A protein has these predicted regions:
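Beta-strand-turn-beta hairpins that frame and shape the catalytic cleft
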Residues: 3-13, 109-119, 160-163, 236-242, ...
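Conserved beta-sheet core of the metallophosphoesterase superfamily
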Residues: 76-80, 95, 173-272, 281-283
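A general structural motif
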Residues: 7-9, 37-40, 74, 114, ...
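Active-site-proximal loop/helix segment associated with metal-binding centers of metalloenzymes
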Residues: 115-206
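Active-site neighborhood of phospho(di)ester-bond hydrolases with catalytic His/Asp-centered motifs
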Residues: 14-17, 43-48, 76-84, 103-105, ...
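Core catalytic region of metal-dependent phosphoesterases/phosphodiesterases
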Residues: 2-6, 15, 21-112
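Active-site environment of divalent metal-dependent phosphoester hydrolases
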Residues: 19-25, 50-54, 83-91, 109-110, ...
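Well-ordered, non-membrane alpha-helical segments in soluble/globular domains
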Residues: 25, 57-67, 146-153, 201-210
């Protein structure tokens, strides 16, 4: 386990799946210093950054533009891997790491002034049969199994893990895959073409069940923040509090329409850990 020390930073933010480095750039350019993200902060992306879909040089050039903004505003950007990322590019030696951008390996711990955050990437691509191996899909995309060595490293930590930042989530958190699946569930539709999908997806989320159990034995986890599901879920009474962050919407996603108003989503789903009840994405428009 690698430990990154950013204890000089108090402000901590998270956002959901950007699906592209250009979107990460747009989030940084448009939302830093706009009453959404403060300067002097650590920001976590919950995976699916689109790393590896282009060649190294192209990705590096795009990340340099992001890094320039991070330097200007004294921001440290932490990218964890999703299922739409090349896992081999997420480590301490990644050629894509920048001065203020870290593509972190699984089970990296980031220490800030108030919180210690463990990063756990990976998930199963439900549309993998429609993707190209080693270009838009990678076989080792799933959540890393918690082996004995990792268990011992977790037990040996001399500080508390306060927050889990992951791409996927345990089986008992939203969205729950209630069986038998119905045709309105994308997992069901893709499983028609992929005979191993349901089992692989269940195993992947079960890995996070085991991780949660192991972490809870020696830590008091306050929040578990994740992405992957392209929706916003917020557990009310669970401990830890589980929060799923929605993906980035370039246009709008209508949630509810009345005679007088339109409730919709747009932009990134940004979570300020010091103000967890405020989210950037949901808007109300009078009509």
């Amino acid at each position: 386990m690698k430990i990154i020390n950013f204890t000089q930073y108090k402000n901590v933010y998270f956002f959901g799946d950007p699906h592209g480095i250009n979107i990460i750039y747009d989030i940084l350019r448009s939302y830093v210093n706009e009453d959404n993200i403060s300067d002097n902060s650590v920001i976590f992306s919950c995976g699916d950054n689109g790393i590896g879909f282009d060649d190294i040089k192209t990705d590096s050039n795009k990340l340099k533009l992001c890094n320039d903004i991070c330097i200007k505003h004294n921001i440290q950007l932490i990218l964890i891997r999703g299922n739409h990322d090349n896992p081999d590019l997420y480590n301490e030696s990644s050629p894509l790491n920048k001065s203020n951008i870290s593509l972190v390996d699984d089970f990296t711990v980031v220490k800030t002034e108030d919180y210690n955050i463990i990063c756990i990437g990976g998930a199963i691509s439900i549309d993998r049969t429609d993707r190209v191996l080693n270009k838009t899909y990678w076989k080792n995309e799933g959540t890393r199994i918690l082996d004995d060595e990792l268990k011992e490293e977790i037990k040996s930590l001399d500080f508390n893990i306060d927050i889990v930042c992951s791409h996927n989530c345990p089986t008992y958190q939203k969205p729950k895959d209630e069986y038998p699946l119905t045709s309105d569930n994308p997992l069901f539709n893709w499983s028609i073409w992929d005979s191993k999908l349901l089992d692989d997806n269940f195993i992947d989320r079960s890995n996070l069940d085991a991780i949660h159990k192991e972490l809870s034995m020696s830590n008091k986890i306050k929040y578990w923040i994740y992405g992957h599901f392209h929706n916003h879920y917020d557990s009310i009474e669970s401990k830890p509090k589980f929060i799923c962050l929605d993906m980035y919407y370039k246009n709008i996603k209508i949630l509810k329409k009345t005679n007088n108003s339109l409730i919709y989503k747009t932009g990134p789903d940004i979570l300020d850990i010091h103000n967890i009840n405020k989210f950037n994405q949901i808007k109300i428009k009078e009509i």
